[in-house]
Curated annotation (Swiss-Prot):
Disruption phenotype: RNAi-mediated knockdown results in defective compound eye morphogenesis. Maternal RNAi-mediated knockdown results in partial female infertility and, in early embryos, abnormal aggregation of Golgi apparatus and disrupted cleavage furrow ingression. GO terms for biological process: compound eye morphogenesis; mitotic cleavage furrow ingression; positive regulation of protein localization; regulation of Golgi organization. Keywords: ANK repeat, Cell membrane, Cell projection, Cytoplasm, Developmental protein, GTPase activation, Membrane, Metal-binding, Nucleus, Repeat, SH3 domain, Zinc, Zinc-finger. It comes from Drosophila melanogaster (Fruit fly). ANK repeats lie at residues 585-617, 631-660. Residues 839-849, 1007-1017, 1058-1078 have a biased composition (Polar residues). This is ArfGAP with SH3 domain, ANK repeat and PH domain-containing protein.
Amino acid sequence: MPPSLIAVSEFVEETRSDYSSPTTSTFASRMPDCRHTIGVLEERLEFDREGLTKLKKAVKAIHNSGNTHVDNEMFMVRALERLGGKVIEQDEPDIGAAFLKFSVVTKELSALMKTLMQNINNIVMFPVDSMLKSELRGVKGDMKRPFDKAAKDYEAKFIKIEKEKKAQAKEAGMVRTEIDAAVVAEEMEKERRLYQLQTCEYLLKYKDIKTKTGIELLQHLIEYYHALSNYFKDGLQTIEHFGTYIGDLSEKLHEIKQKQDEDRRSLLDLRTVLRSTPDFERVDNVPSSESRSGGAGYSLHQLQGDKHHGVTRQGHLLKKSEGKVRRVWQKRRCRVTSDGFLDIFHADESKPPTRVNLLTCQIKPVPDDKRGFDLISYNRPYHFQAEDEGDQKAWMAVLVNCKEKALTKAFQHANPQMSPSLVELQKTVIRYVQLLPGNDRCCDCGSRNDVTWISLNFGILVCIQCSGVHRDLGVHHSRIQSLTLDNLTTANLLIARAMGNSTLNDIMEAKLGRGKLQHESSMEERYDFIRAKYVAKRYVMRTCSDDNDLRCDLEQAVVNADMSQLLQVWAEGADLTCCLPSSDAGETALHLAVLREMGSTLHIVDFLIQNMPPKGLNKATNPAGLLDVTGKNTALHLCALHDRRECMKLLLRSGADYELKNSQNKTALDIAKEMGHNSCRELIECAIKREKSAFDHINTDWNLPNEDGSTDFSDDETVIDERKSRSRPPSFAGGDSPVLRSRSSTCDSIQSSSSPIANCPSRQFTLPSGLPSYTHSAGTSPKQHISVGQYLGSATNVGGNGPGNGGSSPSSASSQSVRAARNSLNMQSDLGGHVTGARKSTSTANMNSLKKRTAPAPPPGTLGSASSSSFYGTLPHPPRHSQNFDASDIRAINHKNQSLDVAYGTLPHLRSVESSPRGGGGYGYGVSQDPGGSGNGSNNSLMPAMTTFGHKRSPSGESLNRNIHLAGAKLVLPPTGELPTLKHVDKSALTRPKIPPPGPPSEREISNGQSNESISSMDEGPVAPPRKLVNQSANFPDYESWHTDMDSSGGGLDHSAESNVSSSDNDRLNSSPDNPSKTGGAGLGGKFHYNGQRRCRALYDCVADNDDELEFKEGEILIVLNERTDDENWMEGIIEGQPTRKGMFPVSFVHMLPD
């Protein structure tokens, strides 16, 4: 039964009963009711506190406005007194006396108003202010804190005695489940009396406060009523007394007006007589009503020039000099240029002419001179005279035409005509924003009426009433524009596309409760609420204890590209310009966001730019150290260095200083020119020319829903939300459900720089059952690592923007989980490298319980030992968020299998982001000196290699189980946990890396996380070239057709001559660990040998679902090119006799023929 309220009389009766007879009292049973009652009373006091605060504000506003009214009335009194005194001096005593009488009445009424304002201050505001500063001071819960302490002491003592009684009963061999309060009444008497005393004290204070806020406040309001009544009575008495004089004054004014009308008629008659005189000479310069209405007044329609005269002209004109002594006409040569200027030459034409900008001039004809015209500039007028009237019209027409042309050109340059596709993109983005959760109503008041106003820096939609309050806050708090009236550019919509009203209110109104605005709220209420929400941030839930926590969360938000987390830290007061905690180079969140921006996190960059202090845009990193390549780089320097053109647009449009220099004394423009980033160079040049229209539109992956259902996309151009159910499982390990994914959802293909898709969902990986998961706590986003596709794109187009991928959720790692992984791998090593049937029996339950994880990069280590020469190449990436476990654990894993000789080469680094020698702090910006991946360059740390799948297939449960056991693969998978798939590209247009990353080892190849067999060929899908080893001096090979030769006896890799692989498109070689005859000799000296191609017959008709699948009919003969693909239920082959028909086919559709 829930506790109920206890009345004061009941409390007194229960307390007296307990005081007289503690053992028979029932007070202990009513103590929960007392606590509940105190809580309810505290809520009522909080409501009274809020009500009195608002009452005080209202009374204070009335008092201030009333005093202002009194002051203005006194100004009026003094003006009337001066006016009356002046009229009396002009022999008009009646009118002067009336002015003075009005001043006296106004003064008396003003005195009454002043008395009323004093009364409202003394009678109402002073008592209310006293209550708020005495009884109701502090915050909710302050007054009942002594009661809470007494209740806590009572409960602690009761629990202690209860434990003692139960222990005594247990020693006596009895079981005591409950302790009666009467049994411990005597022992608890002190605590119970204190509880009763504090309750009594609280009730006394409560009654005193309710008396003051109720009865006494109403008595004060009664006094105010009497004061108000006296004010109106005295005022009415003054007005009535003045009313008698008003009647007399009206009669006097009527008489005075009649006399003035007689005088006016006499003057009019006299004027008529004078004008009728025959020999009267009229004076032309006397203005009449007609001349005032016409003439050289302002004309709405300006001069129109004759287009036949063109926009250029030169010749001689007479110009009137501006001398102080004498003004003469001087003949000067003049020239009108097509760019909107008039050049006036001097008498000595060798001097440079005076140039007048026609855009700031006005051309006017001279009414009295048909050959003359005036040119009015911003600082002086020019008076010209042509040879004749025709010449004058020609000059004026040319001047007007040239001015119109310059004006049209200026308007077109300021707002260039956008292409229809760009206009459609704007409309589509706006429609998408309006459909976001919560955007159908005002973010602040919930109104559905005219929700067409957007706050650009918050990305929310508000109604027209709330938009006015946002404007009052100032642009440093909220930048308001209209979706319908303003021409919003795509750069204005970046934050709005990623935010939404619901997302913002979940954070900014987390502690609001029931006090939200309503659509019928007044403007005063809107102002108070919106200011408290956005300026004071009063309703934000605090999640960080200090500034260091805020800085850590800020860095995490940028790393994860998490807009909600970024908004949270901003709302909690984080300094967006502070140095990040893990940076030794002094990088801010903006530096990190720019470095990690690959095309899909521009909203993070824009939010930082728009909501940080202006000085943060130009904040530079620390000066360069002894081992650093460069230092003192601003965000604009990093954009120029790494070709972040879209980030540069956002920075330049917000006013970033492009003239700042780094430690190498280079500006961003110098760096862009040096690096060959022409797009960045052009953007900075536009900023220098003040051509800000170049920054209006952003090229990014908007990730908008496709409204045209007929549009056909290939598999690697579509992204399906990983959270939705799938029709077939993907071809990589892990997943939400092994049977609910379609292969088209595996958006792990390596996108080229022109790919429209950037937001691929985060990948999921699994370890064998019993192996604990671990991920690095940096909360990795794929922006942390540069994808192979971006490198392939950068080989031909340095300025290409590689697409980004969505961030994955962060999680923490522990050394225990790493050691558990090592132990599990040791067990697998003892079992050997081949897979038994039991390995394939992983339960579906285990697969469904898998968690998302990312593979951390191994820490730096020393490579090249004779017993373990396996080391992994890596793509360049900022290392400081990825090394979260001990190097000893990784070395123990890598060195477990002594017979492995696999060496994975490193992709050549194109202006790669290197790790700072300081060990995890900051970002260096040099070029890697180890393109061959030998491990002996500047970046010789042990890093994970990019693992690729050449074919996106939908495996059965068996192959999925096979891929799930990638325990050791976490050391070679990409740090972001992605398994990218190659996209079909034009090989002739690409410069390939020297040694691309290896393909994924299957479970049969895994032993202690490393491969003990030859690496299978990398499948590109439609293309299946053979592989052969050539000298390293050859050109870069095709990335999709890479083979490495391994020695099963542990001979190791020959480092003296690093190998490269060239490719052709005829057929494909394959090596199998089960057939040693297919592998060559030890080391690099051995070649791959192929003993023959297997053939199979089609059992059924097969229709291709994807462009890389083979379509065939029943009975056709297929030649197998590759038996071992990333999905063991699929092979690659061609139709016999038809080599153009090539692709992947399911094993279950064919019957293998004997060799």
